[in-house]
Design a protein with these regions (language model features):
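The C-terminal cap of the DNA-recognition helix in HTH/winged-HTH DNA-binding domains
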Residues: 97-98, 143
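GST-like domain detector, emphasizing the conserved glutathione-binding G-site
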Residues: 1-79, 83, 93, 100
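Residue-level recognition of oxygen-bearing side chains
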Residues: 21, 133, 146
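GST superfamily/GST-like fold recognition
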Residues: 53, 58-60, 102-130, 138-141, ...
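Domain-level recognition of soluble alpha/beta enzyme cores
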Residues: 43, 132-133
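Alpha-helical packing segments of well-folded alpha/beta enzyme cores
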Residues: 81-88, 137
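Terminal-tail/helix-coil boundary detector
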Residues: 150-152
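Solvent-exposed, charged/polar functional surfaces in cytosolic regulatory/catalytic domains
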Residues: 87, 91-95, 140
Length: 152
């Protein structure tokens, strides 16, 4: 099988992997996932952005720095992630200008997907102080009812 974390067991013998697939499954029928149309496609657009333009830079730089202790053997790779990560943060910051959330007027799973590694981007060497729209958005997400921080 596809032994990955996270994994969601659905029923007795069905399993779902990949965080964004799990989010889409769990959000179906809720306000966190638009029912159809352009807004739903925009949620998917931001989730694909997170997977292909954000996570490969920010999450990998964070892993090398925080969990591996930035070993000399990985320093070049770590430094190579900074430009792409900052490019992703710039795209996000520009999009959030004049907006509270990534899609529509309320939080969606697009916000959840992007929040995950963005709020710990500093652990990968990314300085968020130059991205004030992101900083405001992070605080907005953290003030939502039911917000639960990441377990260390």
């Amino acid at each position: 099988g596809n032994e990955k974390i996270p994994v969601l067991q659905v029923g007795e013998s069905e399993f779902l992997v990949e965080s964004n697939a799990i989010l889409n499954f769990l959000a179906e029928g809720s306000a966190l996932l638009p029912g159809s149309g352009l807004d739903r496609a925009k949620v998917l657009q931001w989730q694909f952005f997170e997977q292909y333009s954000h996570e490969p830079y920010i999450a990998v730089a964070r892993f090398i720095n925080k969990y591996l202790g930035l070993p000399e053997s990985r320093k070049e790779e770590y430094l190579s992630k900074q430009e792409g990560g900052n490019r992703a943060l710039s795209v996000m910051d520009s999009h959030l200008a004049g907006r509270d959330y990534f899609v529509g007027d309320s939080p969606t799973i697009a916000d959840i997907s992007l929040y995950a590694y963005t709020h710990v981007a500093h652990e990968g060497g990314f300085d968020l102080s130059g991205y004030q729209n992101i900083v405001r958005w992070l605080r907005r997400i953290e003030s939502l009812p039911g917000y639960c921080g990441m377990t260390p």
